[in-house]
């Protein structure tokens, strides 16, 4: 039985994770898991893991690394007591030779003993603080996926990984822009402050109503488009690298961790028991 978005907005973390794990909820996670850090995923063979870690280190705005699994272990114990990467994301993209091969709600059959999981912080995390400040976010209010765009900003390459930065966009009233920028700056594990705001052409974006991922979001009177570095950036780099196998979250469909949204270090206390 499916579970609706509005119900999950007020559910506990345990209820939310159970709905995702069972397949009862397969949609976006914006506005869900209030108080907890959300994460983008990149899962790739160990042979490419060090180069990918270098890529994240060299590009911390779009790739804020919050967790790395042990090789072959799908249990991300540093991010949560019982997180199983194979089932605990609403939707996954499976790439083969750099091409999107399938979209799945469960990657148990795709799992291999040589895979390493990288978790990267997500801007959905700071959205709760923005909304608590009284700034409405159109995609959350309308049950849509935040719009994401390929920008003209080059990332720093590492090994086979390279490409343009992807950015997410939120429309904000002009008199609240500086405030929203400062709110998000307090969440460096979730991309931090915006990389740009104003005319989208400055990022090489021709039409904000034609996003590369997610849903188009209208720009209302007196609103300014604000752009944050986005964790879909690694997916662009992975496509360019043409790895034989790579699995990511479907854009907008995140892993919700047990880590507090304002944590300085993205490791839950229960991880100490696993040493």
From Swiss-Prot:
Entry-linked Gene3D superfamilies: PSTPO5379-like, PSTPO5379-like domain
Signal peptide coordinates: none
InterPro entries: D-Glu_cyclase, Putative_hydro-lyase, UPF0317
A Pfam family annotated for this UniProt entry: D-Glu_cyclase
Any one Gene Ontology molecular-function term assigned to this protein's record: D-glutamate cyclase activity
Name under which the protein is recorded: Putative hydro-lyase SPO1111
NCBIfam families: PRK05463.1
E.C. number: 4.2.1.-
Keyword Lyase: yes
Organism, as annotated: Ruegeria pomeroyi (strain ATCC 700808 / DSM 15171 / DSS-3)
EC category: lyase
Alphabetical GO biological process terms: glutamate metabolic process
Homology family: Belongs to the D-glutamate cyclase family.
Keywords: Lyase
SUPFAM superfamilies linked: PSTPO5379-like
The keyword Lyase is assigned to this record: yes
